[in-house]
Amino acid sequence: MIVDKQSDSAISKRKFRTGEVMLDIKKIFSLMGILALAFLICGVLELSASPRKHIIVIDPAHGGQDAGVKLTGKVYEKDITLAVALTLRKELAKESNLEIILTRDSDKEVSLEDRRKNIAKIKPDFVLSLHTNAGFGKSASGFELYCPEFNKDFKKDKKTAKGDVRQEKNKYLNDSVRSARSIQENLNTLFPRKGRGLRRADLPITEDLFVPAVFVEMGFATNPEDKNKLLSPDTQTEIANALAKSIKSFYR
């Protein structure tokens, strides 16, 4: 029997090349798997490395039947606080590291108790409560700022040491004061010599809650000059921008 050595050689080469192709395909799939895994790991690492968003609660006082102080026949405190809050939310929403939540975003009545419950549920990093002032005669004018006293004991479990509670309380108070001072500085620029100081008080909105907070009285509805400013959409925007500047700088 005559063996065709040339044919055998050709067949061997075909088999070898086929093996090479199969090997190359396996390598390609292996590399694809490694790359896919690498992309997945990078995505997870990037996600885990993303900065946590700071939750800011803006509380426009009053709403609905609870109108607050009357400025004109048709405009009340509830309207001013909501207008400033909506503008402030729009400005702060530009910051990727902030999440903004309003206690109300329309002319609806939300009880103080419900506001506190919502804040307790949200557990924000900061609460800003907006109001307009009144009283003390027509001569009283300017803005006022308040920080929580945090006088009441923390509602902690028995395992929490008193030293830890005191340290946490001091942090909340310090953050509140620092935020208030920044707001005071920016509002002073807007309303020169109109600041009535920074005070500490038990704030209704944060009663039994321990969270950094500032209570802002934006001006006196009973003062003609203050009232005209509060009624001005331009001034409302300026107030919102001043507040936004303070919050941005604190949570930068």
Specify the residue positions occupied by each region the protein language model found:
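Bacterial N-terminal signal peptides that target proteins for export
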Residues: 15, 23-34
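Bacterial N-terminal signal peptides
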Residues: 32-43
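Short glycine-rich His-centered loop
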Residues: 54-74
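Sec/Tat signal peptide C-region and signal peptidase I cleavage site
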Residues: 45-48
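Short, Lys/Arg-enriched N-terminal segments with co-localized hydrophobic residues
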Residues: 8-21
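Active-site-proximal helix/loop segments of hydrolytic enzymes
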Residues: 51-54, 79-252
